[in-house]
Amino acid sequence: MESIPAVWRKSTLSGSNGCIEVAFVGGQVAIRHSKDPSGPVLIFSPTEWEAFLAGVRCGEFDLR
């Protein structure tokens, strides 16, 4: 992943708090922790990423 240039983005709502950053590289979605940019990167296919976003939207991951 480091050999491919990526434009990392994070939510403007995160401020200076730790947050995930997302990059779209080579038809895949990469995520990493903003406070550890040289740390591990998770790679997802577009289908996996869409499934994750659908879960977020419907509250599947809410800690209640």
Which residue stretches match the model-derived regions?
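Positively charged, low-complexity terminal tracts
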Residues: 1-64
